[in-house]
Amino acid sequence: MRNCLVAQSGGPTVAINSSLAGVIQGAIDSKKFDKVYGSLNGVQGLLNGCLMDLTEKVEQVPMFIELLKKSPSMYLGSCRYQLPDYTEDDAPYAYIFNKFETYEIDAFFYIGGNDSMDTVDKLNTYAKAVGKDVKIVGIPKTIDNDLCITDHTPGYGSAAKYVASTLLEIGHDTSIYPINSVTIVEIMGRDAGWLTGASVLARNKYNHAPHLIYLPEVAFDEAQFIEDVREAIKKYNNVVIAVSEGIKNAEGKYISATSAVEDTFGHSQLSGTGTVSYTHLRAHE
């Protein structure tokens, strides 16, 4: 028999260790693998030779898998490493697949979001190109629910609950004042408004917040935004606005991207959408 390898990457969620537990338990139950190895800090663990025997861990700690399901953060750690195009630099790929042979790995499971799935795709493409029979499997995890062809991913539900709970508390806190107020809450979501949209769950018969919601899927119109706020203030006095970090104007340009920096995968690290929205409001007082 052969072995399998699993790694985690991206940001932590309340569910990502449950996915890891599922891989370990599933591999053991299948009886197709002698050992389940874990790569520490994502694909970088492979490049640095940092692997651990998870099968041994299960044998040493009988409750390990059950404890893992309830553990926060990421048991195997994470990374922000981007593999190069193998046609330009195949050295990391050759090293990784050499490790697969050394540890007799038949299947590699990578738990993560879009960037992790990019790594999965690159490794799978390389494997086919050089005739390596290693199964490369991506396991979805992302709190902003933006993985293609995926209805909802592990991690989104808990993040959506957090957003809704936070907006509910903000709504109650701001409603106590007799003066007009506008509170803008900027929520994660570069190109997908699922998390910001989840803020609507805060509404109930005692709380109308968030009164206004702006998503990246709909072009942001400054004039309409100002008018929306004016009408909301007339009706509610204290207005709470949920706005996605990735809202764009009619030209498709990010509202907050003027001073954005890029991460290791070339994504704009957006911030300041709330500040820009606030500036628009102050300019039309």
Segments from the language model and where they lie:
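Conserved anion/nucleotide-ligand pocket segment
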Residues: 179-214
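Glycine-rich oxoanion-binding loops at beta->alpha junctions
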Residues: 51-105, 168
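Short Gly/Thr/Asp-enriched flexible loops that form oxyanion-binding sites at enzyme active sites
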Residues: 19, 23, 115-130
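N-terminal phosphate-binding or glycine-rich loops at protein starts, especially the Walker A/P-loop
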Residues: 1-51
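Short glycine-rich or small-residue beta-strand-to-loop segments that form or flank ligand, phosphate
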Residues: 3-13, 74-79, 106-112, 138, ...
